[in-house]
Amino acid sequence: MSITKSISTRRMSKGFTLIELVTVIVILGILAVFTLPRFANVTEQAHDASIQGVKGALASSVAIVHAQWVANGQPTADPNRDNLVGFGRGDIDVSAFGWPTSTNGSNNPSMDAIRCVEVWYGILQSSAPIVDTAGNVDYRVSAPGGDCVYTYNRDNSGSNIIYDADTGEITGNIF
């Protein structure tokens, strides 16, 4: 008798009942309702962190260009501020105050969008985000008032990084 009872008990304990399955599905649904908004916010935080990281990289690169300009014995009366020796490919042009302005021989700190693109690619590493004045790029470039404005294009928030070639200051707005 005990052998028969043991066999029938084993058969009964295989698998889940319908109530157990429904209970697990309900619990998973409740967890999804509470955790989904948290994970959705992670994407926005990732975009913000990306912008902050690029802003920091740009600020560091601008400071390194300026430090190299000072290390080269500037400021002096030497009007030639083209092709900064000792930095990158040697094609960075700087203003009278040692801030990067272009890679094509222009030292005027009042920037236009094309020169802003040149500065971006001239001072940042080759793995930097893609910038241009139009198109589907990481940052869209403009130069209102002579400052470089790099507007983040991946989340349509309008967040931006601003470079002032007069002072070397990097600021930004994250929305």
What are these regions (language model features)?
Residues 1-16:
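N-terminal leader/signal peptides at the extreme start of proteins
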